Amino acid sequence: PYIDALLGDIDLDPCSTHQANNQFLRAKRIYTMEDDGLNTEIPWTGKTYLFPPTYGRCSFSQKRGTWKWNMSGLGRSRIPSVVWFNRLEKEWKLRNIPEALFFSTNPEMMRVCPNIWGYPICIPTKRANLVNGRDFYTLPTPFTWGFFIYLPRLDLGFNQADQFKEIFSHLGKIIC
């Protein structure tokens, strides 16, 4: 209900599955792992929700000019959440995306991606009991904390984060 209250109809989820999208988010357009939303040259457009994979590592191939996700994390690899957030932020700054909500359960991102602190963030007081996208099961006890980052609509001027604060303050601490 919080995501819907903030964004309304979602135009894009660049990191999803058909099953999860049909069951929960109902974004108008999604990219699956096979579609490779991270590396697509098609601009991301519209109101966007993004919850990228938080495990494994991403490494950049100079030869291909693309990111590759894997479990090993060899070489100069990066946290997937950071790579996905950077793509989201780029599309938002280009005004392809009017507003976006990013969710991650990787706390390391708070340290290695300082640009997130330029946006309103919600750190919930309770851990999210996440639903596994393949099997639709939840763990009896949530295993990690998560946080939301809001890339706001710019047409609202100085009040751009007010709606986010109003909606998400019921979940936890808002940092602006």
Language-model features: locations:
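Class I S-adenosyl-L-methionine-dependent methyltransferase catalytic core
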Residues: 1-176
